[in-house]
């Protein structure tokens, strides 16, 4: 009787099909997870219409034109209002022209922990965006100029050591108010307060989540 050759050690005969099946299973699993993530982000946010008071809480180019000489007709405005699956919301406003940009974002979270995380992330994003922009923008933090709410940060924004804008962020309870202005400059603390405070008071009184 002819004895069959021995199976090489370390590669059991029954495992020859297991390895490809495991690899295929891992790939399929990753694709499923990836698909679930895509579906989650695609369906977790819904646009919503702002109420009059909610819209009034946002710093827009129309409001800024009461303080600055702006030819607002030459720029582009953008609104994006999203309500997420956990009930949190984000209101995003942007105006841009050749020399001016104005970004005002309001975020409302479901709890204090999330609001603190959003508060920190928003400011860090500003710093990173300025660091890697085509024209490097420096942040001159000076919280003594203006403060508000439970937490806040104020900074002038500089290019070539010259102030040409400012940024401000504040947290009140579970709400975050952020404004990033370029080509719009106020340096006097009283003028800055006159510009920001009316909108912040509306922001503080508005619940947004009702």
Feature locations, PLM:
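N-terminal "mature-domain start" segment
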Residues: 35-103, 131-147, 200-204, 209-210
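A short, solvent-exposed beta-edge/loop patch
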Residues: 45-50, 135-210
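Long, charged/polar, surface-exposed segments that mediate recognition or autoinhibition
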Residues: 104-140, 195
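Hydrophobic membrane-insertion alpha-helices, especially the h-region
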Residues: 22-38
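Short, surface-exposed beta-strand/loop "edge" segments at domain boundaries and coil↔beta transitions
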Residues: 98-105, 113-119, 162-165, 178, ...
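Low-complexity, intrinsically disordered extramembrane tails and loops of integral membrane proteins
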Residues: 1-15
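N-terminal export and membrane-targeting signals
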Residues: 13-23
């Amino acid at each position: 009787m002819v004895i069959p050759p021995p199976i090489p050690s370390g590669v059991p005969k029954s495992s020859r099909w297991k390895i490809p099946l495991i690899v295929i299973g891992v790939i399929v699993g990753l694709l499923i997870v990836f698909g679930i993530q895509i579906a989650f982000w695609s369906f977790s946010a819904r646009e919503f219409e702002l109420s009059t008071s909610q819209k009034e809480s946002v710093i827009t180019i129309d409001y800024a034109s009461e303080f600055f000489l702006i030819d607002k007709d030459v720029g582009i405005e953008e609104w994006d209002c999203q309500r997420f699956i956990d009930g949190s919301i984000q209101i995003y406003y942007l105006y841009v022209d050749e020399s001016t940009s104005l970004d005002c974002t309001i975020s409302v979270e479901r709890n204090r922990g999330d609001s603190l995380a959003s508060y920190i992330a928003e400011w860090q994003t500003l710093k990173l965006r300025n660091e890697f922009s085509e024209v490097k923008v420096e942040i001159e933090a000076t919280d003594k100029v203006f403060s508000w709410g439970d937490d806040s940060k104020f900074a002038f924004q500089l290019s070539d050591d010259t102030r040409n804008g400012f940024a401000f962020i504040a947290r009140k309870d579970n709400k975050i108010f952020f404004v990033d202005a370029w080509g719009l400059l106020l340096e006097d603390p009283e003028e800055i307060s006159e510009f920001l405070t009316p909108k912040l008071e509306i922001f503080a009184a508005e619940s947004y989540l009702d």
